[in-house]
Swiss-Prot record:
The keyword Ribosomal protein applies. One of its GO terms (molecular function) is structural constituent of ribosome. This protein is located at the 30S-50S ribosomal subunit interface and may play a role in the structure and function of the aminoacyl-tRNA binding site. The lineage of its organism: Bacteria, Pseudomonadati, Pseudomonadota, Gammaproteobacteria, Enterobacterales. Disulfide bonds: none annotated. Belongs to the bacterial ribosomal protein bL19 family. It comes from Pectobacterium carotovorum subsp. carotovorum (strain PC1). This is Large ribosomal subunit protein bL19.
Length: 115
């Protein structure tokens, strides 16, 4: 039974997901439905957490909008997510960057990874 489930999940997983890590700045384009119109909306910010669970994988992106911190959790293989583009690579030493929630200004900056 689990073999069938794994096969179905593998078919539904996206193949074009770029490799990104916590600390990277990404732009996620998401389909938004407003009334009868459907359009793409971009959300750009720093990846603060990644949850790897196959088809159920998710990642959290944080950005500052009008001086207010905004976090959004995206399902990696969701049909709502159109594309993910890595804008900048960040050098961090932790897997979860929740400490950025308390930081503002220069202390919230992340060094750029050179490789």
């Amino acid at each position: 039974m689990s073999n069938i489930i794994k096969q179905i999940e593998d078919e539904q997983m996206k193949q074009d997901v770029p490799a990104f890590r916590p600390g990277d700045t990404v732009e996620v384009k998401v389909w938004v439905v407003e009334g009868s119109k459907k359009r793409l909306q971009a959300f750009e910010g720093v990846v603060i957490a990644i949850r790897n669970r196959g088809l159920h994988s998710a990642f959290t992106v944080r950005k500052i909008s009008n001086g207010e911190g905004v976090e959004r959790v995206f399902q990696t293989h969701s049909p709502v997510v159109d594309s993910i583009a890595v804008k900048r690579r960040g050098a961090v030493r932790k897997a979860k960057l929740y400490y950025l929630r308390e930081r503002t200004g220069k202390s919230a900056r992340i060094k750029e990874r050179l490789n």
